[in-house]
Amino acid sequence: MNKGDESLGTGLLYLIATPIGNLADISHRAKETLAACDLIACEDTRVTAKLLAHIGAKVPTTSYREENERRKAPELADRIERGEKIGLVSDAGFPAISDPGFRLVRECRRRKLPVVPVPGPNAAITALAVSGLPTDKFLYLGFLPNKSAGRCKVLEQWKDFPGSLIIYESKYRVEKALADMENVLGPDRNLCIAREITKIHETFNIGKISDLKTSFAEKSGKGEFVLVVGPEGYVL
């Protein structure tokens, strides 16, 4: 355990990054921190149970999801105030980034309780780094709205941003999102479609939106996606 963590001498909240696909990517510090927690708050207890079994840690877990976050945040903060060390994880990546966690972190900050990050894998930054698109300036949009009108409104708002746009999309909506991107951003924008990062079927497809939309429609759309869009006029 990091000496700085132990020296706090009180309850605290750990934000612990977990692998985004390949369990071998978990850090030594993350393993130590998970094992030292009194309780782990997680999106899906079944997913976290597999991770804990993989690292050989036996720690109780509690469900912390979008549906119960408003209720659980103050309850967990109460436990931290009583001296417990609680770890917060998402199913994959860093908690509170397009995943539950913001309300618990905010509650801890309001109460002046320590919040300690344990950094690690992040799908958005990984996809950006390998895309070949500009990395000096970027805007993370997270998940776009479910409906086309909402997606188009967000894309229209940021289409002139002078850097790369990073978008998460589910396998159920990615084809529709690509169609909206072509309509709003134009067919010639450069795009990277990152799928199943660090997993067996990892792929990175890079090209113009129009070309990738056509080729994507001819292939299986299974997996988890990060879309990185280059700025207007950028030539790959």
Q: Language-model segments: which ranges?
A:
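Short active-site oxyanion
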Residues: L34-I40, L113-V116, S164-L165
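Glycine/small-residue-rich loop that forms an oxyanion/phosphate-binding "nest" at active or ligand-binding sites
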Residues: R65, A73-N122
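Class I SAM-dependent methyltransferase SAM-binding "motif I" and its flanking Rossmann-like core
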Residues: R103-F161
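A contiguous loop/helix-start segment that scaffolds small-molecule binding in enzyme catalytic cores
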Residues: T10, K85, S164-L236
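Alpha-helix capping/helix-boundary segments
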Residues: R46-T48, G93-F94, A123, R173, ...
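Conserved helicase motor
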Residues: S63-R70, L144-S148
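Glycine-rich, flexible N-terminal cofactor/catalytic loop recognition
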Residues: N2-E66
